[in-house]
């Protein structure tokens, strides 16, 4: 469950390390974002010579949350940290690699590229 001011790890090699949510997209008063939702983020920490620089604003898709996601069979998938993947204007990932597992809930037409790059799909 991500809201404004939440900080997330970046799960791709775009150059950003930590980002902060500045807006949850999808409705005028939408408060929370979960796995698979798109948010606007500001880069708070970046590596030198990366594509993303500190202070840049990007769209991002949430790929892991501490809150987790409930499956139809009743099971819950939770993670230790919140994480997101930075997206360009076409909602394609900026990085060419994805770090860590992602959930099966990302398997929509929009995010199949992220699922195919991920080392593990839970």
Swiss-Prot record:
Pfam families documented for this protein: Ribosomal_L14
GO BP terms: translation
Cross-referenced InterPro entries: Ribosomal_uL14, Ribosomal_uL14_bac-type, Ribosomal_uL14_CS, Ribosomal_uL14_sf
Keywords associated with the record: Ribonucleoprotein, Ribosomal protein, RNA-binding, rRNA-binding
GO cellular component terms attached to this protein's record: cytosolic large ribosomal subunit
Origin superkingdom: Bacteria
GO molecular function: large ribosomal subunit rRNA binding; structural constituent of ribosome
PROSITE patterns: RIBOSOMAL_L14
Function: Binds to 23S rRNA. Forms part of two intersubunit bridges in the 70S ribosome.
Family: Belongs to the universal ribosomal protein uL14 family.
Subunit structure: Part of the 50S ribosomal subunit. Forms a cluster with proteins L3 and L19. In the 70S ribosome, L14 and L19 interact and together make contacts with the 16S rRNA in bridges B5 and B8.
Protein name in the entry: Large ribosomal subunit protein uL14
């Amino acid at each position: 469950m991500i809201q404004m001011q939440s900080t997330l790890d970046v799960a791709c090699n775009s150059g950003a390390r930590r980002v902060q949510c500045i807006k949850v997209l999808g409705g005028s008063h939408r408060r929370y974002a979960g796995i698979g939702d798109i948010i606007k983020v500001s880069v708070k920490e970046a590596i030198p010579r990366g594509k993303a620089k500190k202070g840049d604003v990007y769209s991002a898709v949430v790929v892991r949350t501490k809150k987790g996601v409930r499956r139809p069979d009743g099971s819950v998938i939770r993670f230790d940290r919140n994480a997101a993947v930075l997206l360009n204007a076409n909602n394609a990932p900026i990085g060419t690699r994805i770090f860590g597992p992602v959930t099966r809930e990302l398997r929509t037409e929009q995010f199949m590229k992220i699922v195919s790059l991920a080392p593990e799909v839970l």
